[in-house]
UniProtKB/Swiss-Prot annotation:
Periplasmic topological domain: 39-42, 83-91, 147-155, 200-224, 320-332
Membrane topology: Multi-pass membrane protein
Name of the featured protein: Probable uracil permease
Cytoplasmic side: 1-14, 63-65, 113-124, 172-178, 249-261, 299-301, 355-365, 402-414
Amino acid sequence: MTNQIPPSLAENQSKLKQSFVGLQMLFVAFGALVLVPLITGLDSNTALLTAGVGTLLFQFCTGKQVPIFLASSFAFIAPIQYGVQTWGIATTMGGLAFTGLVYFALSTLVKLRGAEALQRFFPPVVVGPVIIIIGMGLAPIAVDMSLGKNSAYAYNDAVLVSMVTLLTTLSVAVFAKGLMKLIPIMFGITAGYILCLFLGLINFQPVIDAPWFSLPKLTTPEFNLEAILYMLPIAIAPAVEHVGGIMAISSVTGKDFLKKPGLHRTLLGDGIATAAASLVGGPPNTTYAEVTGAVMLTRNFNPNIMTWAAVWAIAISFCGKVGAFLSTIPTIVMGGIMMLVFGSIAVVGMSTLIRGKVDVTEARNLCIISVVMTFGIGNMFVDVGNVSLKGISLCAIVAIILNLVLPKAKNEVE
């Protein structure tokens, strides 16, 4: 964490230049940021607002020491979709607001017992398969949208647009250099959108009718015990992944943010940002690896850059035409992007197992991973009174319990 890192280019920059670099950072995050609300049916302008406010809250909790940007989390896409269908948006937001308690609990655990305590309760054998289930559970949604199911798009148009979008995103991710490599989603959406224009699939009337200035669509949360219990365990995977995000930005800047301001404070900041976003109708927040990559490339280590990125996000959220334009992006374009993004989530879970050197031939690990994968892919559910546990939440609970109950192999016992 204390490698010799070249000095930040932002240290002596003027406020004006810092503001433009902040806008650049927001642009890097923009594609992924708005993708979550577009997929889940939430308001894009609200997502921009809560990303900006969430980043500022994170900076407040961490003493403005960490150059990191928080925005919409992909881990909550399936839970939000299920929640909206089951309880409606207001109750779903109420359940998501309570996920901040998971971050608070982990923050307290780290404060009292140290970061090593997370390894005991949430080792790679627990977190890895849960993340895989998050990605695999979303795969059917991506395919259905790519094929134009439940939409007015013809099959041939849907496949053409989604595949062009996917191939463009793949090409940029693999072959592009520099900052371009960090925004493959933006390039994919642009290519798919232009093709849709040629095919006559875009209706610009909502953009024409929308005002330049309008308030983001805020939602007052409602609270339901079943929704809360369903959402709480889902926060475990992104909360543990938060540690990886902080380690990454520490490596990039040459500063150990796990010690100063401390992992307990970064977890608390992420949790408060997530709860605050949900309380007004925005998707939960998480740290963005794309922005960390941009920080590495540009060597802009000054946290003020992220303050400006947050301010830009808040300012743009009040432009009605931005939200209206984003709403014109066809679902078949989103489907093409999602096939890569959701698969990537599953790969992150696999890499968690690999980096953690999890021996899948060892009976204990094999049992944990197998049960979690079967429960997740097979849509297992458990009814307890009026509460039903299913999907990612059930998988997370089962993984934690099995990890605590099943005896470790002799060579794993400390």
